[in-house]
Protein backbone atom coordinates (compact mmCIF):
# COMPACT_ATOMS: atom_id res chain seq x y z
CA UNK A 1 0.00 0.00 0.00
CA UNK A 2 1.37 3.42 -0.97
CA UNK A 3 2.06 5.99 1.68
CA UNK A 4 -0.59 8.69 2.12
CA UNK A 5 2.04 11.40 2.47
CA UNK A 6 5.05 11.46 0.18
CA UNK A 7 7.48 14.09 -1.01
CA UNK A 8 7.58 15.22 -4.61
CA UNK A 9 9.38 17.87 -6.61
CA UNK A 10 7.42 20.57 -8.43
CA UNK A 11 8.56 23.01 -11.09
CA UNK A 12 7.90 26.53 -9.83
CA UNK A 13 7.47 27.77 -13.39
CA UNK A 14 4.92 25.36 -14.88
CA UNK A 15 3.90 23.07 -12.00
CA UNK A 16 5.39 19.87 -13.48
CA UNK A 17 5.66 17.11 -10.85
CA UNK A 18 8.58 14.71 -10.53
CA UNK A 19 9.51 12.04 -8.02
CA UNK A 20 13.13 13.26 -8.00
CA UNK A 21 14.98 16.52 -8.39
CA UNK A 22 15.96 17.50 -11.92
CA UNK A 23 18.15 20.34 -13.07
CA UNK A 24 15.99 21.15 -16.09
CA UNK A 25 12.22 20.86 -16.28
CA UNK A 26 11.24 18.54 -19.17
CA UNK A 27 7.97 20.45 -19.68
CA UNK A 28 8.98 24.14 -19.81
CA UNK A 29 12.77 23.62 -20.25
CA UNK A 30 13.61 26.02 -17.41
CA UNK A 31 16.65 25.39 -15.19
CA UNK A 32 16.80 25.09 -11.37
CA UNK A 33 13.07 25.48 -10.81
CA UNK A 34 12.29 22.29 -8.84
CA UNK A 35 11.43 22.49 -5.14
CA UNK A 36 10.49 19.66 -2.81
CA UNK A 37 7.02 19.59 -1.27
CA UNK A 38 5.06 17.20 0.93
CA UNK A 39 2.05 15.77 -0.89
CA UNK A 40 -0.96 14.07 0.71
CA UNK A 41 -2.03 11.60 -1.97
CA UNK A 42 -5.21 10.58 -0.14
CA UNK A 43 -6.35 14.18 0.28
CA UNK A 44 -5.58 15.02 -3.32
CA UNK A 45 -7.51 12.02 -4.60
CA UNK A 46 -10.49 13.02 -2.45
CA UNK A 47 -10.40 16.69 -3.45
CA UNK A 48 -10.03 15.84 -7.10
CA UNK A 49 -13.36 14.02 -7.32
CA UNK A 50 -15.94 15.82 -9.39
CA UNK A 51 -19.60 15.64 -8.48
CA UNK A 52 -21.80 14.28 -11.27
CA UNK A 53 -23.67 17.02 -13.11
CA UNK A 54 -27.24 15.74 -13.01
CA UNK A 55 -28.74 18.83 -14.65
CA UNK A 56 -26.04 19.51 -17.25
CA UNK A 57 -27.59 20.24 -20.62
CA UNK A 58 -25.92 21.51 -23.79
CA UNK A 59 -27.25 24.80 -25.16
CA UNK A 60 -27.14 25.87 -28.84
CA UNK A 61 -24.73 28.72 -29.49
CA UNK A 62 -27.45 30.75 -31.20
CA UNK A 63 -29.64 30.55 -28.07
CA UNK A 64 -27.03 32.22 -25.85
CA UNK A 65 -27.68 35.93 -25.32
CA UNK A 66 -25.06 38.49 -24.40
CA UNK A 67 -25.69 42.05 -23.32
CA UNK A 68 -23.76 45.05 -22.06
CA UNK A 69 -25.24 44.55 -18.60
CA UNK A 70 -22.90 41.58 -18.08
CA UNK A 71 -20.07 44.05 -17.50
CA UNK A 72 -19.90 45.99 -14.26
CA UNK A 73 -18.26 49.40 -14.36
CA UNK A 74 -15.73 50.03 -11.60
CA UNK A 75 -16.27 53.81 -11.86
CA UNK A 76 -12.55 53.99 -12.67
CA UNK A 77 -12.23 54.65 -16.44
CA UNK A 78 -8.52 53.75 -16.47
CA UNK A 79 -9.23 50.33 -14.95
CA UNK A 80 -12.31 49.77 -17.12
CA UNK A 81 -10.17 50.51 -20.19
CA UNK A 82 -7.67 47.78 -19.29
CA UNK A 83 -10.44 45.30 -18.42
CA UNK A 84 -12.11 45.90 -21.78
CA UNK A 85 -15.07 47.95 -20.58
CA UNK A 86 -15.65 46.74 -17.04
CA UNK A 87 -15.71 43.61 -14.89
CA UNK A 88 -17.33 40.58 -16.52
CA UNK A 89 -19.62 38.59 -14.24
CA UNK A 90 -18.13 35.24 -13.32
CA UNK A 91 -14.61 36.26 -14.32
CA UNK A 92 -11.40 35.50 -12.43
CA UNK A 93 -8.96 38.42 -12.52
CA UNK A 94 -5.34 38.16 -11.35
CA UNK A 95 -3.61 41.40 -10.32
CA UNK A 96 0.17 41.08 -9.92
CA UNK A 97 2.84 43.53 -8.85
CA UNK A 98 5.78 44.18 -6.57
CA UNK A 99 5.16 44.45 -2.81
CA UNK A 100 4.11 47.96 -1.83
CA UNK A 101 3.27 49.02 -5.39
CA UNK A 102 -0.41 49.61 -4.54
CA UNK A 103 -2.29 46.42 -5.49
CA UNK A 104 -4.31 46.30 -2.27
CA UNK A 105 -5.02 50.04 -2.43
CA UNK A 106 -6.28 49.73 -6.00
CA UNK A 107 -8.61 46.85 -5.20
CA UNK A 108 -9.83 48.53 -2.01
CA UNK A 109 -10.82 51.53 -4.12
CA UNK A 110 -12.55 49.17 -6.56
CA UNK A 111 -14.47 47.67 -3.64
CA UNK A 112 -15.44 51.16 -2.50
CA UNK A 113 -16.80 52.08 -5.93
CA UNK A 114 -18.64 48.81 -6.49
CA UNK A 115 -20.19 48.73 -3.02
CA UNK A 116 -21.33 52.30 -3.67
CA UNK A 117 -23.37 50.89 -6.57
CA UNK A 118 -25.28 48.72 -4.05
CA UNK A 119 -23.31 45.63 -5.06
CA UNK A 120 -22.41 43.19 -2.30
CA UNK A 121 -18.62 42.99 -2.02
CA UNK A 122 -16.47 40.67 0.12
CA UNK A 123 -12.83 41.62 0.76
CA UNK A 124 -10.79 38.67 2.06
CA UNK A 125 -7.35 39.46 3.46
CA UNK A 126 -4.76 36.95 4.53
CA UNK A 127 -2.04 39.54 5.09
CA UNK A 128 -3.62 42.33 7.15
CA UNK A 129 -5.88 42.54 10.19
CA UNK A 130 -9.28 44.22 10.14
CA UNK A 131 -7.83 47.21 11.97
CA UNK A 132 -5.05 47.65 9.39
CA UNK A 133 -7.54 47.52 6.52
CA UNK A 134 -9.74 50.04 8.33
CA UNK A 135 -6.83 52.49 8.69
CA UNK A 136 -6.06 52.24 4.98
CA UNK A 137 -9.73 52.59 4.09
CA UNK A 138 -10.06 55.80 6.12
CA UNK A 139 -7.34 57.35 4.00
CA UNK A 140 -9.23 56.52 0.81
CA UNK A 141 -12.67 57.80 1.86
CA UNK A 142 -16.06 56.63 3.07
CA UNK A 143 -17.31 53.13 2.37
CA UNK A 144 -20.77 51.64 1.97
CA UNK A 145 -22.17 48.97 4.29
CA UNK A 146 -22.36 46.68 1.27
CA UNK A 147 -18.62 46.02 1.71
CA UNK A 148 -17.74 43.26 4.17
CA UNK A 149 -14.26 42.34 5.39
CA UNK A 150 -12.95 38.91 6.29
CA UNK A 151 -9.51 38.00 7.62
CA UNK A 152 -9.03 34.35 6.76
CA UNK A 153 -6.54 32.09 5.01
CA UNK A 154 -8.48 28.81 5.03
CA UNK A 155 -10.02 28.31 1.60
CA UNK A 156 -12.71 26.01 2.97
CA UNK A 157 -13.87 28.70 5.40
CA UNK A 158 -13.81 31.33 2.66
CA UNK A 159 -15.87 29.10 0.39
CA UNK A 160 -18.44 28.55 3.14
CA UNK A 161 -18.76 32.32 3.70
CA UNK A 162 -19.17 32.96 -0.03
CA UNK A 163 -21.84 30.27 -0.40
CA UNK A 164 -23.71 31.67 2.61
CA UNK A 165 -23.49 35.42 1.88
CA UNK A 166 -23.50 35.16 -1.95
CA UNK A 167 -21.51 38.35 -2.69
CA UNK A 168 -21.36 39.68 -6.23
CA UNK A 169 -17.69 40.70 -6.04
CA UNK A 170 -14.90 38.96 -4.09
CA UNK A 171 -11.31 40.13 -3.57
CA UNK A 172 -8.66 37.65 -2.37
CA UNK A 173 -5.54 39.34 -0.96
CA UNK A 174 -3.41 37.40 -1.64
CA UNK A 175 -3.38 33.99 -3.33
CA UNK A 176 0.04 33.21 -1.80
CA UNK A 177 -1.48 33.28 1.72
CA UNK A 178 -4.45 31.01 0.97
CA UNK A 179 -4.39 27.52 2.44
CA UNK A 180 -6.27 24.52 1.08
CA UNK A 181 -6.59 21.87 3.79
CA UNK A 182 -6.65 19.12 1.15
CA UNK A 183 -3.06 19.97 0.20
CA UNK A 184 -0.32 19.24 2.72
CA UNK A 185 2.29 21.68 1.44
CA UNK A 186 2.82 25.13 2.93
CA UNK A 187 0.87 28.22 1.79
CA UNK A 188 2.45 29.86 -1.23
CA UNK A 189 3.85 26.61 -2.60
CA UNK A 190 3.22 25.45 -6.14
CA UNK A 191 0.59 22.92 -5.10
CA UNK A 192 -1.26 25.33 -2.82
CA UNK A 193 -1.39 28.14 -5.36
CA UNK A 194 -2.56 25.83 -8.13
CA UNK A 195 -5.23 24.07 -6.08
CA UNK A 196 -6.48 27.27 -4.44
CA UNK A 197 -6.84 28.99 -7.80
CA UNK A 198 -8.74 25.98 -9.11
CA UNK A 199 -11.23 26.20 -6.24
CA UNK A 200 -11.71 29.94 -6.77
CA UNK A 201 -12.27 29.35 -10.48
CA UNK A 202 -15.01 26.84 -9.68
CA UNK A 203 -16.66 29.37 -7.35
CA UNK A 204 -16.48 32.17 -9.93
CA UNK A 205 -17.94 30.10 -12.77
CA UNK A 206 -20.41 28.11 -10.69
CA UNK A 207 -21.90 31.04 -8.74
CA UNK A 208 -21.39 33.77 -11.40
CA UNK A 209 -19.22 35.82 -9.03
CA UNK A 210 -16.44 38.12 -10.18
CA UNK A 211 -13.27 37.39 -8.19
CA UNK A 212 -10.11 39.49 -8.02
CA UNK A 213 -6.93 37.69 -6.92
CA UNK A 214 -3.83 39.53 -5.72
CA UNK A 215 -0.58 37.81 -6.67
CA UNK A 216 2.95 38.76 -5.69
CA UNK A 217 5.67 38.75 -8.33
CA UNK A 218 9.12 37.19 -8.30
CA UNK A 219 12.40 39.03 -8.82
CA UNK A 220 12.04 38.27 -12.54
CA UNK A 221 8.81 40.29 -12.60
CA UNK A 222 6.32 37.43 -13.10
CA UNK A 223 3.57 36.26 -10.77
CA UNK A 224 4.95 33.93 -8.11
CA UNK A 225 3.72 30.37 -8.49
CA UNK A 226 3.34 27.97 -11.41
CA UNK A 227 2.87 29.36 -14.91
CA UNK A 228 -0.38 27.39 -15.08
CA UNK A 229 -1.84 30.00 -12.70
CA UNK A 230 -1.94 32.56 -15.51
CA UNK A 231 -3.56 30.02 -17.83
CA UNK A 232 -6.36 29.29 -15.37
CA UNK A 233 -7.56 32.86 -14.82
CA UNK A 234 -9.49 34.95 -17.33
CA UNK A 235 -7.51 38.17 -17.00
CA UNK A 236 -3.96 38.95 -15.87
CA UNK A 237 -3.09 42.53 -14.93
CA UNK A 238 0.35 43.77 -13.89
CA UNK A 239 0.70 46.85 -11.70
CA UNK A 240 4.03 48.45 -12.59
CA UNK A 241 6.01 51.40 -11.31
CA UNK A 242 8.73 52.52 -8.95
CA UNK A 243 7.83 52.70 -5.27
CA UNK A 244 9.95 55.86 -5.05
CA UNK A 245 7.89 57.54 -7.79
CA UNK A 246 4.24 58.56 -7.68
CA UNK A 247 3.14 57.09 -11.02
CA UNK A 248 1.65 53.62 -11.46
CA UNK A 249 0.86 51.80 -14.70
CA UNK A 250 -1.71 49.01 -14.94
CA UNK A 251 -0.99 46.78 -17.92
CA UNK A 252 -3.06 43.87 -19.21
CA UNK A 253 -1.04 40.87 -20.41
CA UNK A 254 -3.99 38.48 -20.80
CA UNK A 255 -7.67 39.23 -21.26
CA UNK A 256 -10.27 36.83 -22.56
CA UNK A 257 -12.82 39.63 -22.72
CA UNK A 258 -10.85 42.50 -24.23
CA UNK A 259 -7.59 43.84 -25.61
CA UNK A 260 -4.22 43.15 -24.00
CA UNK A 261 -2.62 46.30 -25.41
CA UNK A 262 -4.34 48.86 -23.19
CA UNK A 263 -2.75 50.50 -20.17
CA UNK A 264 -4.12 52.55 -17.30
CA UNK A 265 -2.09 55.31 -15.66
CA UNK A 266 -2.51 56.23 -11.99
CA UNK A 267 -0.80 58.54 -9.54
CA UNK A 268 -0.28 57.52 -5.92
CA UNK A 269 -1.28 60.23 -3.46
CA UNK A 270 -2.07 60.38 0.24
CA UNK A 271 -5.77 59.77 -0.50
CA UNK A 272 -5.00 56.72 -2.65
CA UNK A 273 -4.64 56.16 -6.37
CA UNK A 274 -5.80 58.97 -8.64
CA UNK A 275 -6.40 58.36 -12.34
CA UNK A 276 -4.31 60.27 -14.87
CA UNK A 277 -6.71 61.20 -17.65
CA UNK A 278 -4.02 62.61 -19.95
CA UNK A 279 -0.90 60.42 -19.63
CA UNK A 280 0.94 62.31 -22.39
CA UNK A 281 0.79 65.61 -20.55
CA UNK A 282 1.77 63.84 -17.34
CA UNK A 283 4.77 62.10 -18.94
CA UNK A 284 6.11 65.31 -20.46
CA UNK A 285 5.89 67.39 -17.30
CA UNK A 286 9.35 68.54 -16.22
CA UNK A 287 10.93 68.13 -19.66
CA UNK A 288 14.09 70.30 -19.80
CA UNK A 289 14.31 73.14 -22.30
CA UNK A 290 17.24 73.64 -24.69
CA UNK A 291 18.90 70.36 -23.69
CA UNK A 292 20.62 68.08 -26.17
CA UNK A 293 19.79 64.39 -26.20
CA UNK A 294 16.10 64.94 -25.46
CA UNK A 295 13.25 64.37 -27.91
CA UNK A 296 9.51 63.70 -27.68
CA UNK A 297 8.18 60.57 -29.40
CA UNK A 298 4.69 59.14 -29.78
CA UNK A 299 3.79 55.55 -28.99
CA UNK A 300 0.48 53.68 -29.14
CA UNK A 301 -0.81 51.49 -26.32
CA UNK A 302 -3.93 49.77 -27.58
CA UNK A 303 -5.93 52.64 -29.05
CA UNK A 304 -4.37 55.40 -26.94
CA UNK A 305 -1.54 57.61 -28.24
CA UNK A 306 0.99 58.40 -25.51
CA UNK A 307 3.64 61.08 -25.87
CA UNK A 308 6.86 60.43 -23.99
CA UNK A 309 10.30 61.93 -23.62
CA UNK A 310 13.29 59.88 -24.79
CA UNK A 311 16.64 60.90 -23.34
CA UNK A 312 20.10 59.86 -24.50
CA UNK A 313 23.54 60.64 -23.13
CA UNK A 314 26.56 59.87 -25.32
CA UNK A 315 30.00 60.53 -23.85
CA UNK A 316 33.56 59.37 -24.38
CA UNK A 317 34.40 56.09 -22.66
CA UNK A 318 37.57 55.59 -20.64
CA UNK A 319 37.21 51.80 -20.58
CA UNK A 320 38.10 49.14 -23.10
CA UNK A 321 34.47 48.05 -23.24
CA UNK A 322 32.14 51.07 -23.43
CA UNK A 323 29.14 50.97 -21.15
CA UNK A 324 25.65 50.78 -22.66
CA UNK A 325 22.44 50.96 -20.62
CA UNK A 326 18.77 51.28 -21.56
CA UNK A 327 16.00 52.11 -19.11
CA UNK A 328 12.38 51.81 -20.18
CA UNK A 329 13.06 50.15 -23.53
CA UNK A 330 14.75 47.09 -25.00
CA UNK A 331 18.52 47.11 -24.49
CA UNK A 332 19.21 45.02 -27.58
CA UNK A 333 17.10 47.36 -29.69
CA UNK A 334 19.22 50.31 -28.58
CA UNK A 335 22.42 48.48 -29.55
CA UNK A 336 20.90 47.65 -32.94
CA UNK A 337 19.99 51.29 -33.63
CA UNK A 338 23.47 52.46 -32.63
CA UNK A 339 24.95 49.95 -35.08
CA UNK A 340 22.67 51.34 -37.81
CA UNK A 341 23.93 54.88 -37.13
CA UNK A 342 27.56 53.74 -37.32
CA UNK A 343 27.06 51.87 -40.59
CA UNK A 344 24.66 54.17 -42.45
CA UNK A 345 25.81 57.69 -41.54
CA UNK A 346 29.32 56.97 -40.21
CA UNK A 347 28.66 58.19 -36.68
CA UNK A 348 31.51 57.00 -34.44
CA UNK A 349 29.98 55.36 -31.36
CA UNK A 350 32.31 52.43 -30.66
CA UNK A 351 34.37 54.40 -28.14
CA UNK A 352 31.39 56.05 -26.42
CA UNK A 353 29.34 55.22 -23.37
CA UNK A 354 25.63 55.33 -24.20
CA UNK A 355 22.74 55.79 -21.78
CA UNK A 356 19.16 55.77 -23.08
CA UNK A 357 16.19 56.46 -20.84
CA UNK A 358 12.44 56.91 -21.25
CA UNK A 359 11.53 59.61 -18.75
CA UNK A 360 8.71 59.03 -16.32
CA UNK A 361 9.57 55.39 -15.69
CA UNK A 362 7.17 54.05 -18.30
CA UNK A 363 8.33 51.08 -20.38
CA UNK A 364 7.75 51.07 -24.14
CA UNK A 365 8.90 48.53 -26.72
CA UNK A 366 6.87 49.65 -29.75
CA UNK A 367 9.01 49.94 -32.91
CA UNK A 368 7.50 53.39 -33.55
CA UNK A 369 9.83 54.91 -30.94
CA UNK A 370 12.91 53.84 -32.95
CA UNK A 371 13.13 57.22 -34.64
CA UNK A 372 12.93 58.96 -31.28
CA UNK A 373 15.82 56.89 -29.91
CA UNK A 374 17.89 57.57 -33.02
CA UNK A 375 17.25 61.33 -32.89
CA UNK A 376 18.05 61.45 -29.17
CA UNK A 377 21.37 59.64 -29.74
CA UNK A 378 22.31 61.91 -32.65
CA UNK A 379 21.29 65.00 -30.67
CA UNK A 380 23.49 64.03 -27.73
CA UNK A 381 26.46 62.95 -29.84
CA UNK A 382 26.46 66.13 -31.94
CA UNK A 383 25.28 68.35 -29.07
CA UNK A 384 22.27 69.51 -31.07
CA UNK A 385 19.18 70.89 -29.37
CA UNK A 386 15.86 69.67 -30.78
CA UNK A 387 13.05 72.21 -30.50
CA UNK A 388 10.69 71.40 -27.63
CA UNK A 389 7.69 71.73 -29.99
CA UNK A 390 9.00 68.92 -32.21
CA UNK A 391 7.71 65.36 -32.04
CA UNK A 392 8.67 62.22 -33.97
CA UNK A 393 7.69 58.63 -34.60
CA UNK A 394 8.72 55.88 -37.01
CA UNK A 395 10.38 52.46 -37.20
CA UNK A 396 14.03 52.25 -38.25
CA UNK A 397 15.22 49.26 -40.27
CA UNK A 398 18.70 47.77 -40.58
CA UNK A 399 19.28 49.60 -43.85
CA UNK A 400 18.66 52.88 -42.10
CA UNK A 401 15.25 53.32 -43.71
CA UNK A 402 12.40 54.88 -41.72
CA UNK A 403 9.35 52.66 -42.08
CA UNK A 404 5.71 53.58 -41.68
CA UNK A 405 3.76 52.70 -38.54
CA UNK A 406 0.08 52.18 -37.81
CA UNK A 407 -2.33 54.88 -36.61
CA UNK A 408 -0.14 57.74 -37.86
CA UNK A 409 -3.07 60.16 -38.01
CA UNK A 410 -4.02 59.49 -34.37
CA UNK A 411 -0.44 60.19 -33.31
CA UNK A 412 -0.35 63.51 -35.14
CA UNK A 413 -3.77 64.46 -33.75
CA UNK A 414 -2.60 63.84 -30.18
CA UNK A 415 0.54 65.91 -30.77
CA UNK A 416 -1.48 68.77 -32.27
CA UNK A 417 -3.85 68.71 -29.30
CA UNK A 418 -0.91 69.22 -26.93
CA UNK A 419 0.46 72.16 -28.91
CA UNK A 420 3.31 70.61 -30.91
CA UNK A 421 4.22 72.47 -34.09
CA UNK A 422 6.61 70.14 -35.97
CA UNK A 423 6.33 66.39 -36.56
CA UNK A 424 9.11 64.24 -38.03
CA UNK A 425 7.51 61.09 -39.38
CA UNK A 426 8.04 58.41 -42.08
CA UNK A 427 7.62 59.79 -45.58
CA UNK A 428 5.29 56.91 -46.48
CA UNK A 429 2.89 58.04 -43.73
CA UNK A 430 2.40 61.56 -45.11
CA UNK A 431 -0.56 60.66 -47.40
CA UNK A 432 -2.51 59.04 -44.54
CA UNK A 433 -2.08 62.09 -42.31
CA UNK A 434 -3.03 64.74 -44.87
CA UNK A 435 -3.00 68.47 -44.18
CA UNK A 436 -5.87 68.75 -41.73
CA UNK A 437 -3.64 69.62 -38.76
CA UNK A 438 -1.90 72.95 -38.12
CA UNK A 439 1.52 71.32 -37.91
CA UNK A 440 4.62 71.27 -40.06
CA UNK A 441 5.06 67.68 -41.22
CA UNK A 442 8.59 66.59 -42.18
CA UNK A 443 8.65 63.24 -43.96
CA UNK A 444 11.94 61.33 -43.81
CA UNK A 445 12.88 58.19 -45.72
CA UNK A 446 16.06 57.28 -43.82
CA UNK A 447 18.19 58.26 -40.84
CA UNK A 448 20.31 60.60 -43.00
CA UNK A 449 17.24 62.68 -43.79
CA UNK A 450 16.24 62.56 -40.11
CA UNK A 451 19.64 64.02 -39.18
CA UNK A 452 19.20 66.77 -41.77
CA UNK A 453 15.76 67.54 -40.30
CA UNK A 454 17.14 68.34 -36.83
CA UNK A 455 20.17 70.22 -38.17
CA UNK A 456 18.10 72.74 -40.14
Stretches with model-predicted labels:
Residues 2-13, 17-81, 88-96, 101-108, ...:
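Peripheral, non-AAA+ core regions of ATP-driven protein-machinery
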Residues 128-129:
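Conserved Rossmann-like nucleotide-cofactor binding loop
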